[in-house]
Amino acid sequence: MKTAVFGRDSGEPGSPCGAPPSLTFTPPATLVPPTHHHSRSTNRGGVSGTGGGGSGGLQGAPGAGGPRASHSSRRTSRLHNNVSALGVLSLGADVLPEYKLQPTRIHHCTIVHYSPFKAVWDWIILLLVIYTAVFTPYVAAFLLRELQDTAKKSRFTEPLEIVDLIVDIMFIVDIIINFRTTYVNENDEACQVVSDPGKIATHYFKGWFIIDMVAAVPFDLLLVSTNSDETTTLIGLLKTARLLRLVRVARKLDRYSEYGAAVLLLLMATFALIAHWLACIWYAIGSAELSHKEYTWLHQLSKQLAQPYTSTNGTIPTGGPTLKSRYVTSLYFTLSTITSIGFGNVSATTDSEKIFTIIMMILGSLMYASVFGNVSAIIQRLYSGTARYHTEMSRLREFIRFHQIPNPLRQRLEEYFQHAWSYTNGIDMNLVLKGFPDCLQADICLHLNRNLLSGCAAFAGSTPGCLRALSMRFRTTHSPPGDTLVHRGDILTGLYFIARGSVEILNDDNTVMGILGKDDIFGENPLLYDEVGKSSCNVRALTYCDLHKILRDDLLDVLDMYPEFAETFCKNLTITYNLRDDAQSLRKKFDRHKLLRMSSSMNKDRYTTPPDGDHGNAAVRRSAESVSRCDSNPIDRRQSAGSRSSSRCSPPHAALTATRSEATPLLRRSTNHHEEDDALFDDIRAFARGNTVTMSPTVAGNSVSPTTAIHNDGIHSQQLSDRSDDYEERRANMFGRRLESIESQMERMQNKFNSDMETLIKLVKEQSIIRNNGSSNEEPNARYRPNNYISSAIRLPNGGGGGVVDEMRVSRLSSHEPPTPTQETDTIL
C-alpha cells in the first residue's frame, strides 16, 4: 500500500497553513495611562500618537507644530530609544516602565533622570563611593598620621591626597546635578515626570541633600591649620561621613536583588567590606594605646616579628612592624573572630581591645548568620529547578508504583514528563497568567501563538479582537515519539495544528494512511457537522511533536462572537486529514431508509387489504402514528401513546383513496430519493394527524397516482364509529399476517445463506486440492474458482468525506454453475 505524505513546507503554495502575501500580523496595542494634556503610546520603535499604530515618530495635534515642537519631539524620541538599552544600567529607582513613558516639556538646562548621561554619571559616582568606602577608613586608621606629617612640609604631593581632592570635587558636582535632574512624582496617579527647577530643589532638600552635603565636605582642608593629635583624630572621624552615601547606593542596588549571582556577589562584598572596617577600628584601638601601654596586641606582634617599637621621652613610638604586616594581621584577627574560629595567635590584651572583641563577636555572629544564610538561600534558588524536577519525578514514580501501572504505560508517562519538562522547564503557563488581568493575558497568548495565527491561511482576514479571542483558547500540547494522540472511536473534540514534528495516521490493521508534518491540520471542521463525530483512525507521533489544539466548542463560541469571520474561516480552512468516521452518517442513513421501507410496506398493505377500506385507512393511520413516533423524543413518545389509547374509542375520520403499484426495492431508487423521502415523511405525519394530505407524483420506479385530496366526511365518520369493534379485530388479524410473513421471509434468507456458505466452503476446498496437486490445466477448473462465483460490490461515491453505501448486492451462488450476467439478484436490506 502506498503511503501518502501530506507534510510540506510552510512557504509552499497551496499549503494549508501557508500565509498569503497580504496577511499581516497586528501586534496588540500598547497600554497608555490617561494624562491631562496628551495621550500617546510608546512602541519599541519610537513614540507614536494614540490612534495610530503608525511607523514611529511623534504625531501632534494640528497647529501645535513648529520648530520648538519638532525639536522637543526629536529629543523625546532619542531619549526613548535609549531607555530600553539603559534600563538595566541605570541606578535610579524611579525609572519609568516603558509603557508609562510620557513625552514631557523639559526645562532648559534640565537633565532627564533616564537619560544616558545621567546613567553614566551615576555609575561614576558609584565607583567613587566604593573607593571612599574602602580607602577612607584605611587612611583614617593607618595613614592619617603619616599624611599629616607630610602635609607640614608640602601640600598635595601624595597621590591619595590628590585622589581625595578629586573625589570631593566630584561629590560637589553631583549635588549640583541633582538640583537639575527630573524625578517622578509618585504621589500623582499619572506618575508624571517633574522638570520644574523649584519643585526639583524642594524634592532634593527633603531627600538626600543632607547626606550628600556631609559626604562632600573636605574636612581635611578646613582643619589644615591645626596640627594636634586630637585634630587629626577628628579629621579621620569626619572623613568617615562619606560612608553615608552607601545608604543611597544600597537603595539603588536593590533593583538587582532578583539576580541570584548579583546578590551573591553583593553579599560577599558586604561581608569583606565590614571585615575591612572592623580591621581598621581594631588597629586604631591598638595604635591609640600604644604610647601609654606596653602590652597591646601591637607590642605582641612586634615581639613575634622581632621588630620592636622605640620611643624617647614619652613620644609616640616609632618603628615596629611594617604597614603591610599591621593591616594583614588586623584583617586576619577580625575575620577569625566574626567567623567564630579564633586561632588565638592574635588576641586582645587591654580592656578596650576586649570590649571591642566582645562587640565584634556579637556582630559577627549576626552577620555570619545573615550573610551565609542568604548565600545558602541563593544557592538553593539556583538549583530550585533541579530540585522541583526530582520532586515531581519521585511523585510520578510513586504514583506508578502505587497503582501498578504496566511497563508500556509507565514508559510513556516518564517520556512525556521528561519531554514536557525540558520544553517548559516546569513552568505552568496557566498558573503564571492566572493572576494577571484578561487584557494582559490576551496579549501574552497572542505573542505565544503569533506564528500560528500569522502563518496559517485559515486566520487570514480576521480582526485583532478575533485573534486575541482565538489565542486565549489555544492550548499547546507536547508528545514524545510513539505516543497516540487520537484513538479510533474517540470523540473529535478539537482541531489540531502541528507546529513541530510529524505524526502518522493508522487504520485498524496499523496500515499507514498518511504522514503529517509541520503546518498540517487534522481533525474535523466543526462548521460542516452539527454533531460531534468520532475518529476513524489512530494518530500517533513519529517524533517529538508540538501541537496547538483548540476545542470544538471554543472555536464555535469565537465564530459566534465574530460571525463575519466564520465564512472566511470556513473557506480558507484546509484540513490535511479529516478524521471523522463516515460510518456514523451511514448508520443514520440506514435507519432513515428502514423507516421509509416500513412506510412503503404500509402503503402496499393499504391498497391490498380487501375487507373494508375504512379499516385499512385506520391501520394506515395507526402505522403512520408509529412511524411519526420513531423520530420524536421520549416526551413526544409518551404523548403519542396517550393519543393512541384515546383513539381506540373513536376511529379515524378521514378516507384515503389512491392507487399504487407494488413498491420498488428501496436501494434501487433514483438519485432524487432524498426529496421523495422528505415528502413521504411529511405525508405520513399529516395523515396521522387527520389533516388533508397532498401526495406528489413520485419519480421513476414508483407508480403513485397524482395529487389526491383527502377530506373529512361527517356521515362516513358516523358509519365508522358504529363498526369500531369489527375494526379492532381486523387490525389484529392484519398485524398477525404481517408477522408471519416476516418470519417466513427470515427463514428463507437463513436457509439460502447456509446453502451459499456450504457451496463456498466446498469450492475453496476443491481449489486448495487442485493447487496442491500442481495441476497446470486451469481452464477446466476456472468455473470452480470462488472469485468467479462471488460477485459482491460495495460501491462508494467518488466524492470526498466518506460516503454512504449506494448499493449492496450479493449474487446468488449455485453449487453447479456460476450465475450469468442476466440472472436476477436478490436485494438484502
UniProtKB/Swiss-Prot annotation:
- Topological domains on the Extracellular side lie at 145-158, 225-234, 283-327, 349-354
A Pfam family this protein belongs to?
Ion_trans
Coiled coil stretches, renumbered: none
What residues does a nucleoside 3',5'-cyclic phosphate bind to? 458-559
Bilayer-spanning residue ranges: 124-144, 159-179, 204-224, 235-255, 262-282, 355-375
Ranges within the bilayer without spanning = 328-348
Location of the region described as Disordered in the Swiss-Prot/TrEMBL record: 1-76, 601-674
Provide the topology term for how it sits in the membrane. Multi-pass membrane protein
Q: Name one GO biological process term.
A: regulation of membrane potential
* Intervals, Cytoplasmic compartment: 1-123, 180-203, 256-261, 376-829
PROSITE patterns hit by this protein: CNMP_BINDING_3 (PS50042)
Localization in the cell: Cell membrane
Lineage top rank: taxon: Eukaryota
Instruction: Please describe, based on the UniProt annotation, the reported consequence of changing residue 464 to S.
Output: In sy674; causes mild contractions of the spicule muscles, inducing spicule protraction in the absence of mating cues
Summarizing the annotation, the consequence of altering residue 203 to N is:
In sy557; causes spontaneous contractions of the spicule muscles, inducing spicule protraction in the absence of mating cues
Specify residue ranges for compositional bias: Low complexity: 640-650
Ranges of compositional bias, category Basic and acidic residues:
603-615
Its primary localisation, in coarse terms, equals membrane
Which cysteine pairs make disulfide bonds?
none
Q: Which family does it belong to?
A: Belongs to the potassium channel family. H (Eag) (TC 1.A.1.20) subfamily. Kv11.1/KCNH2 sub-subfamily.
Q: What's this protein's function?
A: Pore-forming (alpha) subunit of voltage-gated inwardly rectifying potassium channel. Channel properties are modulated by cAMP and subunit assembly. Regulates the movements of the male's copulatory spicules before and during male mating behavior.
Oligomeric state and partners? The potassium channel is composed of a homo- or heterotetrameric complex. Interacts with dnj-1; dnj-1 chaperone promotes tetramerization.
Name of this protein: Potassium voltage-gated channel unc-103
The taxonomy runs: Eukaryota, Metazoa, Ecdysozoa, Nematoda, Chromadorea
